[in-house]
C-alpha cells in the first residue's frame, strides 16, 4: 500500500521521464509506460494527472487511471472526450479531493 509520501519519493531523478527519454512522445503511451517501468509499478498501481488532451490520451493508452485537471482554456468536455476517468475544474478543487481519491483508489484496487 502506497501513500502520498511515496508519490513525493517517486519524483526523484531516477524516476523522471522527459521527452528526451522516449522515441515517441504523447499521445503515445510510451512516456507513461517508461515511467511505470522506472518506478517498478503496474498500471493499476498508478495514477496519471494531466491537464491536456494529448496527455490524457497517453495516460489512458497506457491503461492507467487518468485524472484531468482543467488548468487553462481547454473545455472540460475535451478532456472527457480524450478519455479522462475523472475531471476536476481546477488545481485547488483537485487538491481538496486528493486524500479522498487516495482512500477510494486504495479500496478499489
Functional labels for PLM-detected ranges:
Residues 9-26:
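Histidine/lysine/aspartate-rich catalytic loop segments that bind and position anionic ligands
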Residues 47-86:
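Acidic, Mg2+-coordinating phosphoryl-transfer loop and its flanking beta/alpha structural elements
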Residues 94-106:
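Short amphipathic alpha-helix with an adjacent loop that forms part of the alpha/beta core around
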Amino acid at each position: 500500500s502506497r501513500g502520498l509520501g511515496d508519490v513525493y519519493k517517486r519524483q526523484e531523478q531516477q524516476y523522471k521521464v522527459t521527452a528526451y527519454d522516449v522515441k515517441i512522445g504523447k499521445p503515445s503511451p510510451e512516456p507513461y509506460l517508461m515511467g511505470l517501468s522506472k518506478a517498478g509499478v503496474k498500471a493499476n498501481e498508478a495514477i496519471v494527472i494531466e491537464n491536456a488532451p494529448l496527455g490524457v490520451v497517453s495516460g489512458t493508452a497506457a491503461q492507467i487511471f487518468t485524472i484531468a485537471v482543467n488548468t487553462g482554456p481547454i473545455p472540460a468536455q475535451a478532456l472527457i472526450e480524450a478519455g479522462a476517468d475523472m475531471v476536476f475544474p481546477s488545481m485547488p478543487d483537485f487538491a481538496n479531493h486528493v486524500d479522498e481519491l487516495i482512500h477510494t483508489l486504495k479500496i478499489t484496487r
